[in-house]
């Protein structure tokens, strides 16, 4: 069964670190700062590729991390921006944020792009921090961390071709012969409970996805048997291959089978009958099959191409696959229900509260815990190996109101404050 839902991890590249450097060339007195900025980290970008049909590739790789930007260099040389990480997805992929459960992208058109995780900006070099009062700063920023998240990919497209017919007419056998699919095969009804899918390739290199759908019986549109499950899957196919047991092994009239199945498709959704249909007369290697085929053609009384085959002996399979591939090339996709004449476009606006720059909680041992996206980003972009950077970080905390908030929570001189995996001593 093809994968149609998968959870993956994506992370944009971190920005490159800024550089602390000074000009030291001969004959350049008081050269001043010369540290370049870091380069931007790469984005993780989903790009729709119409050549892909499934999410199978994501079963083997579920972590995608874009490269980080190059670090800044001396002589005011900026680091190189990192290249984006391109991840190809099939048309019809829906991207859902795993934390909020919101749909963040619906990717349908070939070449459509969506940045799922943005890369961080490069850290500023010490040239950026030069002021009249501090013309030679020993301070630079680390690169901004890239965005990271878990997302769920869902693929609603099932197949190009759907095999329909009464139970045990040979649909599963046909699929197993023309593709690498391994459906459950037996001569009792409803062996196929869920759709089996297989990729079919013709001798001239064309390929398509074929679905062996659960068996259909009279009354399916009312939920009898496996009706609704079957019909929901066939809604998505572009070409219907109607398989008929021409040997009449079950004792039913092949023409009656044909009429009943088409009536069920018509009852469920009018648009199903608009799809092109190929009639396949299966089990032609069995006794009386040829006689039944002639009777079927007389009753049908239409100039409709019928492909006599035997899934077991592979008689007629090659011609059938070529006909399906030819039909797919000229068949567009079908909307599930009739289109409204005038589409109404709605835009949803949401009021999003501005997130607080930090939160303070307290552990059982009395340690104060600082958290929050903004304060954690400031921390990660601070170079703690340089005293000026540490002093700047302390000023940033004060300007955000962290010191006052800690005092209000009862923090005293010498108390431990924890941010991420690092501990500091509170100095009042």
Curated annotation (Swiss-Prot):
Residues 1-158 form the Obg domain. One of its GO terms (cellular component) is cytoplasm. It comes from the Bacteria. GO terms for molecular function: GTP binding; GTPase activity; magnesium ion binding. Mg(2+) binds at residues 172, 192. GTP binds at residues 165-172, 190-194, 212-215, 282-285, 310-312. Its cofactor is Mg(2+). The keyword Metal-binding applies. InterPro entries: G_OBG, GTP-bd, GTP-bd_Obg/CgtA, GTP-bd_prot_GTP1/OBG_C_sf, GTP1-OBG_CS, GTP1_OBG_dom, GTP1_OBG_dom_sf, OBG_GTPase. Residues 350-428 form the OCT domain. Keywords: Cytoplasm, GTP-binding, Hydrolase, Magnesium, Metal-binding, Nucleotide-binding. Gene3D superfamilies: GTP-binding protein OBG, C-terminal domain, GTP1/OBG domain, P-loop containing nucleotide triphosphate hydrolases. It is found in: Cytoplasm. Residues 159-329 form the OBG-type G domain. Signal peptide: none annotated. Pfam families: DUF1967, GTP1_OBG, MMR_HSR1. Its EC number is 3.6.5.-. GO terms for biological process: ribosome biogenesis. PANTHER family: DEVELOPMENTALLY REGULATED GTP-BINDING PROTEIN-RELATED, MITOCHONDRIAL RIBOSOME-ASSOCIATED GTPASE 2. Belongs to the TRAFAC class OBG-HflX-like GTPase superfamily. OBG GTPase family. This is GTPase Obg. It comes from Anoxybacillus flavithermus (strain DSM 21510 / WK1).
């Amino acid at each position: 069964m093809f994968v149609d839902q998968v959870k993956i991890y994506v992370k944009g590249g971190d920005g490159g670190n800024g550089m602390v450097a000074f000009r030291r060339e001969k004959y350049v007195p008081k050269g001043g700062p010369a540290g370049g900025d870091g380069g931007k980290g790469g984005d993780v970008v989903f790009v729709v590729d119409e050549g892909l049909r499934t999410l199978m590739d994501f079963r083997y790789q579920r972590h995608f991390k874009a490269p980080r930007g190059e670090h800044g260099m001396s002589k005011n040389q900026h680091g190189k921006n990192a290249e984006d990480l391109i991840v190809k997805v099939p048309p019809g992929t829906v991207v859902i944020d795993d934390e909020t459960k919101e749909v963040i992208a619906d990717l349908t058109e070939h070449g459509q792009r969506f940045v799922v995780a943005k890369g961080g900006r490069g850290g500023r070099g010490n040239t950026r921090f030069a002021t009249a009062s501090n013309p030679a700063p020993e301070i630079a920023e680390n690169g901004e961390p890239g965005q990271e998240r878990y997302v769920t990919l869902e693929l609603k497209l099932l197949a190009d071709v759907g095999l329909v017919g009464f139970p045990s007419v040979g649909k599963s056998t046909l699929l197993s012969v023309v593709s690498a699919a391994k459906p459950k095969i037996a001569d009792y009804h409803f062996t196929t409970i869920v759709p089996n899918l297989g990729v079919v390739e013709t001798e001239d290199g064309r390929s398509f996805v074929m679905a062996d759908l659960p068996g259909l019986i009279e009354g399916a549109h009312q939920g009898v048997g496996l009706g609704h499950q079957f019909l929901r899957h066939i809604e998505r196919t572009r070409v219907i291959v109607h398989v008929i047991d021409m040997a009449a092994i079950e004792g039913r009239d092949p023409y009656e089978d044909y009429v009943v199945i088409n009536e069920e498709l018509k009852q469920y959704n009018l648009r199903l009958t608009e799809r092109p249909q190929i009639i396949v007369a299966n089990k032609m290697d069995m006794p009386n099959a040829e006689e039944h085929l002639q009777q079927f053609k007389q009753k049908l009384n239409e100039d409709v191409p019928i492909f006599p085959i035997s899934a077991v002996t592979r008689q007629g399979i090659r011609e059938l696959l070529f006909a399906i591939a030819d039909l797919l090339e000229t068949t567009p996709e079908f909307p599930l229900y009739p289109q409204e004449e005038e589409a109404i476009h709605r835009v949803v606006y949401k009021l999003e509260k501005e997130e607080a720059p930090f939160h303070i909680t307290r552990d059982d041992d009395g340690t104060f815990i600082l958290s929050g996206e903004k304060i954690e980003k400031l921390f990660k972009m601070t170079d703690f190996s340089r005293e000026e950077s540490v002093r700047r970080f302390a000023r940033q905390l004060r300007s955000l109101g962290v010191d006052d908030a800690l005092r209000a929570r009862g923090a005293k001189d010498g108390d431990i404050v924890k941010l991420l995996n690092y501990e500091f001593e509170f100095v009042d």
